[in-house]
Amino acid sequence: MAAAQQLYDVTRKWFALIPPVLCPVNFIIDAPFGRFAPKDNSIFMLDGIKSWIVMELVSPISFCYAFLQSPLSLTHNGSPPPLSFSHPPTLLAALFLVHYLNRAIISPLRTPSRSKSHISVPLAAVAFNITNGSLMGAYLSSTAAEKFLQGAFERPLFWVGVGLWALGFVGNILHDEILLNIRRSAKAKGKAKADEDDDNNGKSKSKQEHYAIPHGYLYELISYPNYFSEWVEWAGYAFVAAPLPSFTSLSSFLTTVTPPYLFLFAEFFTMIPRAYKGHKWYHARFPDYPKQRKAVIPFLF
């Protein structure tokens, strides 16, 4: 227990420090995947869909292992927590797994195409997801989480937070679906064009990822509503899963911050640069891109 607690605390503090340090770097360097993927076909470029599935599955797997092992629990003695939805930590564990069921399996399998990814991206994502999944699973099965969530179902604010999680989760899926429909439409048109080229010339051009201006829902206000929706999702989750950390000093923050808030902050610091640069990319690529749209926070940024 003592060794597990020490490892948990050290990992938690480093996980709090690294994302804000890397945030300015990501404003300068483009992460080599998606619209910023290199155009070459070197051995370091991986299939976009397969690499995505592998790197994202790491998170729920490491989460389940840590949650079932309960390394920070004084009551479970190494046995799993109660695996019932009447147990608040288990309900929150289920919400975490539902998110990754969609993110790691359903969404990529429904994606008609995805740009290749440089091997550095899935390697970094695997490191992130092992850390995040393990910390989250260890926390939700801990004695501290048990105490904080005792009687949670009787508190209206708990269900407000769960509602925020659900709103963000659905928003994420809705806006991702708009992007998927753009790809599906492009793939259908591309296949028809390729068939025509085959008939006329006996060969077709190499396949390239298609991009267009997305419309609908929050796309009328921001370029990255899927990012914004994910922040709403994990803000609601953190609100119900853990106490708010102290912001009086860096030392007090590192002492009191818990994995649900670490995940939220890490997503924010990681996605802000990507959204800003992607927003600029849209404007550069499409002269008619809506000028009133912000990057990722409606009306603000």
Each language-model region and where it sits:
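Hydrophobic alpha-helical transmembrane segments of polytopic
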Residues: 15, 19, 52-59, 92-99, ...
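Juxtamembrane helix-capping/reentrant segments at transmembrane boundaries
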Residues: 35-57, 118-127, 218, 293-300
